[in-house]
């Protein structure tokens, strides 16, 4: 029966994988719903205060670029050539073949440079033209050939064109998407969890599918009780910090994180899914690798280490078991549980796997940095070639003996190794850090320039254009059966109780990596969500011709901010009523959709503005003269933060002015005032 369950789990998992690759959006079981366009009023303030509304910030985000491009191509005629030119250059930069680059560069030159030069309409500098002409004439077509144009294109777009974008519906849509991104609160309900694919010291790894996009991920779940039992809180939190450091910027050679969240019992990391097994497994199945095969894995691992070291992260656990292959056979470094940030202080802890640890790591109290990873790389490459660590002779398991050999023995390299390979390993396995390859100040560049890698096109490596020596079998789960992986003994943690102070440790654990979420969305449901939202908004605009545009009331007035909030209403204060609010310097006004009355609360009636909680939801509480209360709730985190801030500041400023005002202004008034509905002018859907 267990065998049948394992087979069914494998089939379900493989089917989910195939469908996710083909049409991930079709696998989405939930829908992303964008907020109404009026969210712009709040989000524009929220983002501006965090310096997020600049040309560079928006243009360099995936969703921001797509919306800006859409605006330029459809609304601004003079921007069309620049945007198309920019996209052509970006496509050119991805080419890995010099012949292809030469052909494409000439096409770009003819279409976007020569054509405009002949018509005397070329808007770019003479230096940019001469740079490209000079390199093309010598057939020097590097991936950075058009870089001067990239800079000048961006400069031409960041002025009036960007300002017009900021006033457009496309910027409103950007605000809608950012509101969704900044209000992500993940739970297990957001994922369909498939079979177990691995297990570690604190928990298991599962294949899973994200419900609202259909994308497949690996979910690493750490058990909070097991962490507490083993006093592993620092390790667990450190892994989340290290993953957040290395998961920004494109690096195809690290198993990166897109989300982190926690439940009452688990810490969950949502990671890149790797289906090809690890190098330790393939070493046991395939046997030792040739120099050429090893070189392939070495180049990809070096770029992964380079990405970490550039962010001042030392990995500290490089070994074949931690190198995972994707379905095509390309390698990624996984499991950053022992990684460490050395930007402010160098580590000196003795951690890692015996047989791969550098001498300075074994010498307790000795500080080290990225130097340790280059030694470990030498150990790992030796194992791929010989089947064992250079310091683990005759399959010894005595850790003290392995450490003693690491600290004292000079590795003897077989005569079958090429001179270049011997030189590489001798350089990496130097016990003296000052003599070690990669530790002379040049870091990864020193290693990449070694003669063993002569002829390697590192851009080719980065773009994953070299054919992998080993392609994992398709249609198979390259992981042990669930029965073989096993499970934890629940009796171990039976007596462990999670207290409030334990949960408090994880209050800042949840995280969304913005660029990776945007990449996920744009690859899957972005176009469908935009199309659905356009239809909904068109219907609402048609309806609002009769009802009046709620946001229009703010136009031409001293309105600070406006938008929807939930008001605790009815005589018993038990129901939340959705209303449209307008904040002015001296009052807060609101009304329901289509209502003929406008309600009013003046600043002089308010005694205080406070934060409170109702059923675990953050709320804004107004204490009003006469012992009354007025409670508001927002529909997203950014809205709550911004409304709370603006209401507090407006209230304080009003109090300051009232203290200076003549006494007759302080005559008592009733709690709320009903105003006649003002006449509204029609407008577009920008939300202002």
From Swiss-Prot:
SMART domains: PH (SM00233), RGS (SM00315), S_TK_X (SM00133), S_TKc (SM00220). GO terms for biological process: desensitization of G protein-coupled receptor signaling pathway; G protein-coupled receptor signaling pathway; receptor internalization; signal transduction. It catalyses: [beta-adrenergic receptor] + ATP = [beta-adrenergic receptor]-phosphate + ADP + H(+). It comes from the Eukaryota. One of its GO terms (cellular component) is postsynapse. Residues 54-175 form the RGS domain. Ubiquitinated. Residues 454-521 form the AGC-kinase C-terminal domain. GO terms for molecular function: ATP binding; beta-adrenergic receptor kinase activity; G protein-coupled receptor binding; G protein-coupled receptor kinase activity; protein kinase activity. The active site is at 317 (proton acceptor). Keywords: ATP-binding, Cell projection, Kinase, Nucleotide-binding, Serine/threonine-protein kinase, Synapse, Transferase, Ubl conjugation. Its EC number is 2.7.11.15. PROSITE patterns: AGC_KINASE_CTER (PS51285), PH_DOMAIN (PS50003), PROTEIN_KINASE_ATP (PS00107), PROTEIN_KINASE_DOM (PS50011), PROTEIN_KINASE_ST (PS00108), RGS (PS50132). Residues 1-190 are annotated as: N-terminal. Residues 191-453 form the Protein kinase domain. Residues 558-652 form the PH domain. It is found in: Postsynapse; Presynapse. InterPro entries: AGC-kinase_C, GPCR_kinase, Kinase-like_dom_sf, PH-like_dom_sf, PH_domain, Prot_kinase_dom, Protein_kinase_ATP_BS, RGS. Residues 669-688 are annotated as: Disordered. Interacts with GIT1. This is G protein-coupled receptor kinase 3. It comes from Homo sapiens (Human). The lineage of its organism: Eukaryota, Metazoa, Chordata, Craniata, Vertebrata. The gene is GRK3.
